[in-house]
From Swiss-Prot:
A Gene Ontology term for the protein's cellular component: cytosol
GO biological process, one term: L-histidine biosynthetic process
Record's protein name: Bifunctional protein FolD
Listed CDD domains: NAD_bind_m-THF_DH_Cyclohyd
Purpose: Catalyzes the oxidation of 5,10-methylenetetrahydrofolate to 5,10-methenyltetrahydrofolate and then the hydrolysis of 5,10-methenyltetrahydrofolate to 10-formyltetrahydrofolate.
Organism of provenance: Kocuria rhizophila (strain ATCC 9341 / DSM 348 / NBRC 103217 / DC2201)
Self-association and partners: Homodimer.
Catalytic activities: (6R)-5,10-methylene-5,6,7,8-tetrahydrofolate + NADP(+) = (6R)-5,10-methenyltetrahydrofolate + NADPH; (6R)-5,10-methenyltetrahydrofolate + H2O = (6R)-10-formyltetrahydrofolate + H(+)
UniProt: NADP(+) binding residues: G169, R170, G171, T196, V237
The entry's keywords: Amino-acid biosynthesis, Histidine biosynthesis, Hydrolase, Methionine biosynthesis, Multifunctional enzyme, NADP, One-carbon metabolism, Oxidoreductase, Purine biosynthesis
GO function terms (MF aspect): methenyltetrahydrofolate cyclohydrolase activity; methylenetetrahydrofolate dehydrogenase (NADP+) activity
Keyword rRNA processing: no
Amino acid sequence: MTAQVLDGKATAGQIKEELAQRVARLRERDVVPGLGTVLVGDDPGSRSYVAGKHRDCEQVGLASIRRELPADASQEELERVIDELNEDPRCTGYIVQLPLPEYMDTNSVLERIDPAKDADGLHPTNLGRLVLNVSEPMTSPLPCTPHGIVELLTRHGVELAGREVLVIGRGVTVGRPMGLLLTRREINATVTLAHTGTRNLPELLGRADVVVAAAGRPHMVTAEQVKPGAVLLDVGVSRVPDPETGKGRLTGDIDPAAAEVASWMSPNPGGVGPMTRAMLLVNVVESCERQVFGQP
């Protein structure tokens, strides 16, 4: 058996085409959704990631609002920028690029974001709404990576209702909110949350129908551990030495050999990453639509 590919790039492209049509309808009403980004410092990786978000904006017709601060900016300076974006009607959603300098209080910064403009879907208010709302349509931004994973599976016809899903990793961006989304009644999966301290991980992997690996441990999930026919989503990112070049290269949490056992598997890179960026755009557009049309 060779796993079919959960193609995040192609699926994200489809979502962008759909978003472009929705943005066009908003523009007919003289409304242009806008994505804001706040970047502190000049980290090359962060700068590249932010630039990618603005290229995405251009593809679907969103306005780009960029705010950049020097690496030695104070927390007060950053908070003033956040307050400005909260009040700016051109900005319908924005993100503060992480990580921030160590001397800044990241949680305080993120909590200052207007929940309605929380493009990452990670504001405590929005996560709390996800906890409380099991059955009704969500009317607040969803966490981008978990939402992207569900959308990727749904668009490939992978059934989740009643299936055993193992989530490995307890981070706030993926692991913790993943189960909240999967156990909503409209999805109805049965979820186990594991992490690097889980003692019986091989046993859990052996019975999981779907595995979401987001622990940041290179190849911690092996082909021998995976249930035949399982669906595998590799979210983890680690840098390891390349034996051929001696340089660092990025790798995921799932050994590529597991593709010979799985029924579906997301590539890494090219699987979940593009979906995360697409869901960021979805949050921005939907925030604008809620303002204009009053729809969930």
